[in-house]
Every structure is written in C-alpha cells, then in structure tokens.
Amino acid sequence: MQMCRDICAPAYVEAHTPAAMREELARQRGEGWAFYLHSTADVPDGLVGVCHKTGEIGHLFVKTEARGQGIGAKLLEFAIKKLPEHPRPWLAVLDCNTGAMGLYRRMGFAPDGVRNVFDPATDPNSTRLCRELILRRCLPESGTR
C-alpha cells in the first residue's frame, strides 16, 4: 500500500478500503481469478492472484515486515506453477516499483510493453509520473543448437 500512497492522490487511496477491496476481489473471482494467501506461523503475510483465462499474475503483495525473506519469490513461483497452460505468464508492475522489478527480472520476466501511463498532468488520481509495464516470463533456453 505504501507504493500507492507514493504515487496516488489521497482520495484514491482512501477509496480502497478493505470492504472495497473485498468487493473488487469478488468481482475478479467471477472473471476467472484465483487468489492464494501465504502465511508464516499461521500469520498471513502475502497474497498472489492468477487468472487462468489470460495467464496474468497479479495482486502479488508481501507485508512490509515480512519482506526480504523470499516470500515474494515463493509466491511468484507458486503462481507460475498454477498456470501450466500458459508457458509465458505475464504481470503488470509500475516502473517506479524497483524492488518488484528486480524480483520479476530475477524470476525470468522481461518487459513486453506498457499498459498504462499515470501522469499527474492528465490523471487526477496520480501524484507522480510512472508507467505500468507488462512483463512476460521468458521461455527457458532449450539448450539445442
């Protein structure tokens, strides 16, 4: 949520209450999304979603106090395994989210386009310019010549 506070207008962040987010996740489940919670010692500390219809991985979050423990990598690897029908799953990430960008690149994802541009000059919900990039998983090298 800190990333949202850094780039989104306060009114936009405040509108994303727990109740509003539950409604949004319920709507997305109706569109083919499945969500998985990660817990450590029975305490939820991460979430990831996958869409079997499109091969998209989304809603990958790790609580601030749980970061740096490999949970994000575990969740991403889990999500990839949940999408065997999509050899090149994809996700979207803000280019200003450097921590997530580093993880995704280490896990074999590479830029494959821009989905949105958030520009405060044209978008009242944005407080700073950033791009939402599409990253797609690269196929492993086959090793054949």
Regions found by a protein language model. Give the residues of each.
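Acetyl-CoA-dependent GNAT
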Residues: M1-E65, L76-F78, K82, C138-P140
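Short secondary-structure capping/turn micro-motifs that flank functional sites
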Residues: H16, G46, G99, P120-A121
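Conserved glycine-rich acetyl-CoA-binding loop
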Residues: V43, H59-E77, L94-G102, R106-M107
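Conserved GNAT acetyl-CoA-binding A-motif
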Residues: K82-D95
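Conserved catalytic-core motifs of GNAT/GCN5-like acyltransferases
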Residues: W90-V93, R105, A110-L133
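Terminal substrate-recognition subdomain of acyl/acetyltransferases
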Residues: L129-R145
